[in-house]
Amino acid sequence: MAPAPSPTPLPLFLLLLLLVGVAPLAAAQGQNIQTRFPSTRTPAFATPPPITSPSPSPGTPTATPSSSPPSSSGKRSDIAVAVVSTALSSFAVSGLAFFLFLRHGKKRELTEAGGAGQHYGGAQGGALTGKRPEREPKRPARGNMVDENGLDAIYWREFEKEGDGGRGRKPPASRRPPQPPPPRPYRAERRQDAHESSAPSPPRSRKNRIDQEPLIPRGSLDSASAEFDESLYAPSAGSTSSFSVAAAEAYARPPSTPAITAVSSVPRSSPSPAPAPAARPASPSPSLPLPPGRESPSRPQSIAAAAVASPAPPPPPPPKPAAAAPPPPPPPKAAPPPPPPKGPPPPPPAKGPPPPPPPKGPSPPPPPPPGGKKGGPPPPPPKGGASRPPAAPGVPTGSADQQAKLKPLHWDKVNVAATDHSMVWDNITGGSFNLDEGIIEALFGTAAVNRKTKPADSKDASGGSTSAGLGRSNSPEQIFLLEPRKSHNISIILRSLTVGREEIIDALLNGHTELSTEVLEKLSRLNISKEEENTLLKFSGNPDRLAPAEFFLLRLLLDVPSPFARVNALLFKANYAAEVAQLKQSLRTLEMASQELRTKGLFFKLLEAVLKAGNRMNAGTARGNAQAFNLTALRKLSDVKSTDGSTTLLHFVIEEVVRSEGKRLAINRNYSLRRSGSLAKSTDGGNPAASSTSQGPSREERQNEYLNLGLPIVGGLSTEFANVKKAALVDYDTVVNECAILGNRLAGTKKLLETYGDDGFARGLRGFVKAAEQELNELKGNQEKVLELVQRTTEYYHTGATKDKNAHPLQLFIIVRDFLGMVDQACVDIKRKLQQQKKPTPPPSSSQPAAPAATTKGAADDAPAPAQKPPEEVDSKRKRVMPRFPNLPAHFMKDNADSDSSSDEE
């Protein structure tokens, strides 16, 4: 409700100005009046005078007129001076009266607006009257001036004025929530109430703005904004109450120093600060009344309780901007409060989570703290002052006799009451999570364990079971006729099948092969003994009560005669083709491996080199002069090292064979070298220099050339013996017994078909049995042939090896496979050695002859020593004749070696 408009002093000011200004003029027109100015100084102007020229000093009275009459010009000037002085005096007096009336009206306006004048009206009015106004407000404050915590500052001013005698004035019965005021409500109210068509003079407004001091920094949140009011009076349910957080400071702060945040900037008198209240003893005071608009009278008592424990500090300084106040330390959390103090509350000790209310009193339960705790009054505080929940969460409230006994959970308990700091368990409440005790009793109760063991013990003689006293539902129990573990395994197999029971029965009755091999293999694992079949067939109860495994087996036995024999027959038919193909492949591998060992001449040369080297090393001993040796000695060649340890007997033998093969290849294929030599002889015409040049490289270079040519040939031996390596991996027992196994299974299937006569299953398998019988007969003949070839090959390399019962029948292939691997590694080592020896050397200069060294090396050869030639001609000839070979990998083939050598020759 807007305050009643006060009478404006404007008409009175105009009337007074007219009377004071016109009266002297009217009196001065009829007579010559001597004007005397008052000796006192005029009061200071609130605004600068419009005329800047100095006026005559009013302090000195004018002289009395002389006896002689003045001139006309002197009279006119005296009259003008008198008029001007009178006008200025009138304006000064009128202005002073105007400002007095305006100040009085403003003070009255602010007082009627809700007591706001007690703050800044006392500061300004005190400068004029020298005392604080004591005028009572006619109606409650509008709520447009709040402190930094969102509380009504005018309410606290009124509370201070009441003193220690009582609880203060009662708040109004109903208080409308504050609406968002305009940006400058004070200036708007002044213009509306005073009915001023024009704003006050700019100099006076500017002065007031300069003298005032903003209470909050510019750009910060306006406490009178709509967002602040909504959060103050309508807090959200999920967040901590704004009253419980912000009012803890407001109720504990002295009323003389509220941090007021007004809607508009409030002027304050800088020379006369607000009087600080006298220090009051920290005596208990009655509970504080609730500000207008609050819901529960118990909340202020619970919030201001933490401020009583500490003594009242000295009076604080005049109010400063709210942003500059440092945050005080937080109070002890949830400390039980003593009786509320009397008198105004002391300064705020802390800013943080509010403590819980005192445990005594008829007030409703306090608001929950930030942790979200709920429950009754807290127990006596521990040493640290932190309250703990009265009971552990999850503990049932019933008696021990009514609770079911559960399995124990072994853990170490923690005494949260003995800690002096907050813990995570403080945030756990009894109502945040509800435990379903029925489920936990069913899962972990001892009665549930006993119920699981009773069905096996309660079987009767007929295979059924009783459910009396078990506490189970009315659903029929499953009957287990087999061993429980076997029944469980069969149930797992049945659940993994991808076909239904009817399809399985149809395939077993008609001999269809639509069932996959995987399904047939799983069905073959369901085979049970005769005793178990008799137990299932003797069951005369309801089949629907049987367990899944027993039910399936009983249906299978009743619908299909000899079901597991039929499953084995169908499985044999499904696997027959793959097993026969694998057997044929193994026989073919053994046959080709035997042929490779009989026809490859390079392997013979390796054996010859080993034999000669062994005889040379064993000369003069009983092991010397041997004609043959057991092939098991090939594995020991790498163990015989040279005297200096730089090489082994294996490397020596392989290097000799490589050099021999390279020399043979050089003689047979190096036609370009011979052609170039013959052309050189014909061109030189018998010149000894030319004939010496045609002799080619030295002995060492030729040996290296032979090694480079022979390495691809010897290294490709592993590729030529590929089937020998495969034959070493063949399972000889499988090859020998596979035909017999297939024959026995085929004979059992044939006998089964004869038993069934002419039913669908027999008709479906009769054609397969006939074709398989013929194929197995042919396979047996081929098997005998291949095994005989393997024996002859073994005897070919080692006489009497087949008669050794402890020897492996395929031992020859295994030894050769291992030796070929050693040969490949030796070839790689030789190639690496050649690459290390072949290092680029700078060509000799023309001034230093290098021919004698080359001639000396050439003389060591069997060929006659050629005549010496100039170094330039020898080097050019070597570059033209010397072939180049690429670096070979670890495993190289003969075809690649041939292509490399031919490309080098070209």
From Swiss-Prot:
**Gene3D superfamilies membership:** Formin, FH2 domain
> Listed GO molecular functions?
actin filament binding
Spell out the protein name for this chain: Formin-like protein 16
Q: Which domain of life is it from?
A: Eukaryota
Q: Where is the composition biased (Gly residues)?
A: 114-128
Report one GO cellular component.
membrane
Its organism's taxonomic lineage begins at:
Eukaryota, Viridiplantae, Streptophyta, Embryophyta, Tracheophyta
Q: Give TM segment ranges.
A: 81-101
Instruction: List the source organism.
Output: Oryza sativa subsp. japonica (Rice)
